């Protein structure tokens, strides 16, 4: 009984190592290509609107913050103003 449990655990360990190595090899090729992919995605999502401060960015007036964000008067940072929509 003990031997069969040990053999089962050893087989599961070998399968885990084999699967991890295969996943690492597969992800490794994607990892080399990812910086170019990320740069292309950055260009796609760049806003054509005016530059605005994102969440928790510093601000002095409400118009400094992006849509649906408002400038908090005490600590001067952009936070959600409680609105939804476009």
Curated annotation (Swiss-Prot):
One of the Pfam families matching this protein, by short name: Toxin_12
Tissue specificity annotation: Expressed by the venom gland.
Disulfide cross-links: 52-66, 59-71, 65-78
Major subcellular location class: secreted
InterPro entries: Huwentoxin-1
Cellular localization per UniProt: Secreted
One example GO MF annotation: ion channel inhibitor activity
Keyword presence, Glycoprotein: no
Gene Ontology cellular-component annotations: extracellular region
Signal peptide coordinates: 1-21
Superkingdom of origin organism: Eukaryota
Propeptide cleavage-removed residue intervals: 22-50
Keywords assigned: Disulfide bond, Ion channel impairing toxin, Knottin, Secreted, Signal, Toxin
Entry domain remark: The presence of a 'disulfide through disulfide knot' structurally defines this protein as a knottin.
Functional note: Probable ion channel inhibitor.
Family: Belongs to the neurotoxin 10 (Hwtx-1) family. 28 (Jztx-11) subfamily.
Protein name per UniProt: Kappa-theraphotoxin-Cg1c
Protein source organism: Chilobrachys guangxiensis (Chinese earth tiger tarantula)
């Amino acid at each position: 009984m003990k031997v069969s449990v040990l053999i089962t655990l050893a087989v599961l360990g070998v399968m885990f190592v084999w699967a991890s190595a295969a996943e690492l090899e597969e992800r490794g090729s994607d990892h080399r290509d990812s910086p170019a992919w990320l740069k292309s995605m950055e260009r796609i999502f760049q806003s054509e609107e005016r530059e605005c401060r994102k969440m928790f960015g510093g601000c002095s007036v409400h118009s400094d913050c992006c849509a649906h964000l408002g400038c908090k008067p005490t600590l001067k940072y952009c936070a959600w103003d409680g609105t939804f929509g476009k």
